[in-house]
Regions:
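N-terminal Lys/Arg-rich, disordered targeting/topogenic segments
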Residues: 1-24
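Short N-terminal helix-initiation segments at or just after the protein's N-terminus
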Residues: 6-12, 28-34, 62-65, 92-95
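N-terminal type II signal-anchor transmembrane helix
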Residues: 18-53
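A structural signal for short, hydrophobic/glycine-enriched beta-strand patches
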Residues: 45-190
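A transmembrane-helix-recognition feature enriched in membrane-embedded lipid enzymes
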Residues: 190-196
Length: 196
């Protein structure tokens, strides 16, 4: 009787096309994970940006404004005029730019013009954040400064603080993050200016 004969079980052989499909899916899945990680990381960066200081502002020996936008200069000059420091350095100023040009461009009040001419030094040497920090180190050491307020864009502040703290380990650094008017970080994924 053929029903009594034991037949060896057939083990299913893995389909070769399934393995090939998995090999093709793996890079796509890894790319998707990478893109999701990048988006999540950028979202975290945007949500943790320093915000403008409110309340009483602590006096510092100096103010350092890193060029890159008129709003930074406006804030720096205002802080100086309000007595938040005795001296200010504008670092990374373009060649040929002087105080008279700044007065024209910024539309300063008389008190701000007086502060600009008496208490502000222009640094034309710095080309980047590392250069800003080196110029600031020389400037602050020449004046015996122990505390500085950094004025730069909010998205630039974390990097600037890192570089400046390495260059000026014995100087207390305070931040003054500027929220650029033309940068909408609440809807950064829709705003082309935010993405650049």
């Amino acid at each position: 009787d053929s029903s009594d004969i034991e037949r060896p079980e057939r083990h299913a052989q893995p389909a070769r096309h399934g393995t090939a499909t998995n090999r093709r899916r793996y890079p796509l899945m890894m790319a998707a994970v990478l893109v999701a990680t990048l988006i999540a990381s950028f979202q975290h960066f945007v949500l943790t940006l320093p915000q403008a200081t409110t309340g009483q502002i602590q006096f510092t020996d100096g103010i350092v404004v890193m060029t890159g936008g008129q709003q930074r200069l406006d804030d720096g000059v205002r802080l100086l005029t309000e007595g938040c420091a005795d001296k200010m350095l504008i670092s990374g100023v373009g060649k040929g730019v002087n105080r008279a040009i700044l007065v024209q461009e910024l539309g300063l009040s008389e008190a701000q013009i007086n502060a600009l001419f008496c208490c502000v030094e222009l640094d034309h040497a710095a080309q980047d954040t590392f250069g800003n920090a080196k110029s600031t180190r020389e400037w602050s050491h020449s004046h015996g400064m122990q505390s500085l307020r950094l004025v730069t864009a909010n998205y630039h502040m974390p990097r600037a603080l890192l570089i400046f703290s390495r260059e000026l380990p014995n100087v207390d650094l305070y931040q003054w993050p500027v929220n650029p008017d033309d940068l909408d970080l609440s809807n950064w994924w829709w705003d082309p200016a935010s993405l650049r």
